[in-house]
Swiss-Prot record:
It is a multi-pass membrane protein. G- protein coupled receptor activated by antipsychotics reserpine leading to an increase in intracellular cAMP and its internalization. May play a role in locomotor activity through modulation of dopamine, NMDA and ADORA2A-induced locomotor activity. These behavioral changes are accompanied by modulation of the dopamine receptor signaling pathway in striatum. Modulates HTT level via cAMP-dependent but PKA independent mechanisms throught activation of RAB39B that translocates HTT to the endoplasmic reticulum, thus avoiding proteasome degradation. Residues 1-44, 109-115, 181-200, 287-296 are extracellular. It is found in: Cell membrane. It holds the Pfam family 7tm_1. It comes from Bos taurus (Bovine). Glycans are attached at N2, N13, N20. Keywords: Cell membrane, Disulfide bond, G-protein coupled receptor, Glycoprotein, Membrane, Receptor, Transducer, Transmembrane, Transmembrane helix. This is G-protein coupled receptor 52. GO terms for biological process: G protein-coupled receptor signaling pathway; locomotory behavior; response to xenobiotic stimulus. The chain crosses the membrane at residues 45-65, 88-108, 116-136, 160-180, 201-221, 266-286, 297-317. Disulfide bonds join C114-C193.
Length: 361
């Protein structure tokens, strides 16, 4: 009798929409709750680990860019920093499902929490995707129009472009609040998101046509032509070296293009990893919206695989860019020096010595 009353009470509360975010959550991988502790252990570990890595990695990128003036010589640093801030906010936003899985209440209805969280993550990842497309256009202009590049790409235009990216990303997912459908599966850790908020084939097609497809086409077009031009330049240089052994003039004339090529390769790696991690998510998004496939495990894995890209960007950049590695090393040395100075001051209490700029390269 008591069990039936409890079931009726839960059904009534579910239909009235007053369930708290911490009261109900699902285990998408299908293992259910555990008897010892009422949490989804595996899902919690994955999300907590990703949250920590994303926040720590992107904070490092932001500090290195702040302390390494040489990185600001590249106009793409505007977009890289924008991506770092967007990815940092992704990590901070991931604290919401983490707290839900650990039974910490936010005091907000589950449906509203789910919608807001899904919208914010979708907007932030849209910003990253649009920034990658703009970076590819920037490198394309730098290599194809080196003489007029400085007139075409100015700091003012870059700032305007970044503002437009944020506005566009906010607008494109706004219809999700007006019954158009679910913008993604980022909130499916909440049961209301997984069961009551459905995707729509029309809204999914709307997002693909206005965001995913244009960004992918721009990236493919620009990098195809970048590598085509680089291959032509390399062939010309090899021909000149074969004809004229003393090729100092040709080498010096080509030196101006080498940094652009190397930097284009770094950015191409970032873009490639981004789409490799996001492609399974986009494919599942299309299949599930068309009611061809419905699998909570695939939804969870593809979604958080895509979100893990927020950490991969900083790893690729730190491994591929020598200037960034130098900035990271200088930042580490500065932090170690500061720690040593504090210890020496506590031991000897000397007069503080003012430094011009402790973190500049």
């Amino acid at each position: 009798m008591n069990d039936s009353r409890w079931t009726e009470w839960r059904i009534l509360n579910t239909s009235s929409g007053i369930l708290n975010v911490s009261e109900r959550h699902s285990c998408p991988l299908g293992f259910g709750h555990y008897s010892a502790v009422d949490v989804c252990i595996f899902e919690t570990i994955v999300i907590v680990l990703l949250t920590f890595l994303i926040i720590a990695g992107n904070l490092t990128v932001i500090f290195v860019f702040h302390c390494a003036p040489l990185l600001h010589h590249y106009t793409t640093s505007y977009f890289i920093q924008t991506m770092a801030y967007a990815d940092l906010f992704v990590g901070v936003s991931c604290l919401v499902p983490t707290l839900s899985l650990l039974h910490y209440s936010t005091g907000i209805h589950e449906s509203l929490t789910c919608q807001v969280f899904g919208y914010i993550i979708s907007v932030l990842k849209s910003v990253s995707m649009a920034c990658l497309a703009c970076i590819s256009v920037d490198r394309y202009l730098a290599i194809t129009k080196p003489l007029s590049y400085n007139q075409l790409v100015t700091p003012c235009r870059l700032r305007i472009c970044i503002i437009l990216i944020w506005i566009y990303s906010c607008l494109i997912f706004l219809p999700s609040f007006f019954g158009w459908g679910k913008p993604g599966y980022h909130g499916d850790i909440f049961e209301w998101c997984a069961t009551s908020w459905l995707t729509s084939a029309y809204f999914t097609g709307f997002i693909v046509c206005l965001l995913y497809a244009p960004a992918a086409l721009v990236v493919c077009f620009t990098y195809f032509h970048i590598f085509k031009i680089c291959r032509q330049h390399t062939k010309e240089i090899n021909d000149r070296r074969a004809r004229f052994p003393s090729h100092e003039a040709a080498a010096s004339r080509d030196a101006g293009h080498s940094p652009d090529r190397r930097y284009a390769m770094v950015l191409f790696r970032i873009t490639s990893v981004f789409y490799m991690l996001w492609l399974p998510y986009i494919i599942y998004f299309l299949l599930e919206s068309s009611r061809v496939l419905d699998n909570p495990t695939l939804s969870f894995l593809t979604t958080w695989l895509a979100i893990s890209n927020s950490f991969c960007n900083c790893v690729i950049y730190s491994l591929s860019n020598s200037v960034f590695r130098l900035g990271l090393r200088r930042l580490s040395e500065t932090m170690c020096t500061s720690c040593m100075c504090v210890k020496d001051k506590e031991a000897r209490d000397p007069k503080p010595r003012k430094r011009a700029n402790s973190c500049s390269i």
